[in-house]
Amino acid sequence: MCESAVYLIRGEVKSLVMQDAAKVVITDEGAVVVNSLGERKVMKDADLLEANLIRHEILLRPK
């Protein structure tokens, strides 16, 4: 599978949002993270910082 870990970066702190995310959608309100089972986490006021597909890691940051 091609899932990635999604983290929220705040300053020097890197917090895991979802381990095996299959989809990340960035909206005006924030980010929606979905895994392959359909479980969703809504990260209000989050924006994409980096998507590293080699490391299977997606970094979000507060807007």
Segments the model singles out, each with a brief description of its role:
Residues 2-63:
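Compact, glycine-rich, soluble single-domain proteins
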